[in-house]
């Protein structure tokens, strides 16, 4: 597979506005070496405050005993025999259980246990910084503590959306407004470089030695993949998409709709960080289309109505950014 030649890029109907000069990625051999050595992501904003830490390890195959030990620390006034639990099974890599006493779950602690070896893909310290940053701007629940292999945080009231919901105009506009709010969170000091290329090089380093040379000829060789990655970086860095704070993983189940308060909030900040604004938008649209299992549904999304939804989403997302500035809420 040859590296594709350069081609002029067509003008999009919506231009992602850059409000401040954006430093382009300039990965050199030192940065590639840093990624291959397992270095953490470029640092984001500093933590707002210290987070409680408990030296407790929760068995991912038997989560309840460890979760209840943490609840004794976080809610000492709760009687152990009265604590109720509810497991969530939508997660792909992590284990999640809710602990509460009252039926309405108004005071509910979520205990999340990291998936095995996910630290190879996720910078957990950076995740905590993201959590605190978003909380400070009114976009995340309270983070109660971290422990050896996970964290505890406030349960967010509402329902996780499905693919049948995010096409509704009222809801996709709420999603666009929440995305716009997050995108206007300003970095302290100079704007960080996009996290995209660091992650791509890091992922590539993790898998390059695991590719079986006996695989089909349809699977590109490592050298070809490396060339394509360099080509992508060279050309995508020239598109002048603004670098903003992004969620970077906006699949349906990471969007919570609160019908009482009339808003949506995003959850799971493992991959959040400063990145190209266009990536966050495209990632959400990709999850949107990828949620449909049947060819009929896929063509429905790709058709005229899908185009109208995309245009309306972008109009809602980009319009507030002319004047909006998000300041910390606490």
Please tell me what each predicted stretch does.
Residues 253-292:
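Catalytic activation segment of kinase domains across protein kinase-like and atypical kinase folds
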Residues 278-326:
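Active-site activation/catalytic loop segments of kinase-like enzymes and analogous catalytic loops
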Residues 86-231, 235-245, 260-261:
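ATP-binding pocket architecture of kinase catalytic cores
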Residues 64, 68, 197-204, 208, ...:
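An amphipathic alpha-helix signature
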Residues 2-86:
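Juxta-kinase regulatory segment immediately upstream of eukaryotic protein kinase catalytic domains
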Residues 3, 217, 323-330:
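Helical subdomain adjoining the active site within ATP-dependent kinase catalytic cores
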Residues 56-60, 120, 218, 303-307:
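Amphipathic alpha-helical protein-protein interaction segments
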Residues 245-247, 252:
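Catalytic-loop of the protein kinase fold
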């Amino acid at each position: 597979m040859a590296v594709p030649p350069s081609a002029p890029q067509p003008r999009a109907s919506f231009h992602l506005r850059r409000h401040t000069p954006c430093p382009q990625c300039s990965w050199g051999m030192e940065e590639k070496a840093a990624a291959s050595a397992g270095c953490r992501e470029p640092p984001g904003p500093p933590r707002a405050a210290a987070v409680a830490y408990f030296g407790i390890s929760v068995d991912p195959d038997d989560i309840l005993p460890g979760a209840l030990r943490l609840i004794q620390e976080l809610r000492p006034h709760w009687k152990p025999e009265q604590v109720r639990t509810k497991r969530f099974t939508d997660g792909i890599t992590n284990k999640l259980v809710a602990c509460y006493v009252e039926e309405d779950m108004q005071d509910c602690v979520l205990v999340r246990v990291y998936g095995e070896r996910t630290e190879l893909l996720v910078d957990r310290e950076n995740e905590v910084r993201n959590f605190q940053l978003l909380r400070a701007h009114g976009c995340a629940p309270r983070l109660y503590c971290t422990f050896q292999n996970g964290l505890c945080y406030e349960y967010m009231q509402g329902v996780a959306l499905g693919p049948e919901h995010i096409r509704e105009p009222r809801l996709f506009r709420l999603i666009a407004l929440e995305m716009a709010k997050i995108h206007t969170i300003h970095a302290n000091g100079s704007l960080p470089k996009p996290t995209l290329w660091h992650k791509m090089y890091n992922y590539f380093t993790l898998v390059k030695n695991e590719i079986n040379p006996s695989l089909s000829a349809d699977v590109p060789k490592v050298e070809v993949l490396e060339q394509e990655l360099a080509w992508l970086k060279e050309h995508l860095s020239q598109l002048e998409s603004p670098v903003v704070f992004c969620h970077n993983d906006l699949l349906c189940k990471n969007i919570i709709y609160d019908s009482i308060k009339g808003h949506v909030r995003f959850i799971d900040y493992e991959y959040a960080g400063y990145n190209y604004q266009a990536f966050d938008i495209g990632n959400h649209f990709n999850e949107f289309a990828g949620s449909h299992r049947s060819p009929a549904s896929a063509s429905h999304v790709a058709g005229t109505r899908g185009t109208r939804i995309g245009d309306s989403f972008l109009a809602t997302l980009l319009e507030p950014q002319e004047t909006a500035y998000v300041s910390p809420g606490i």
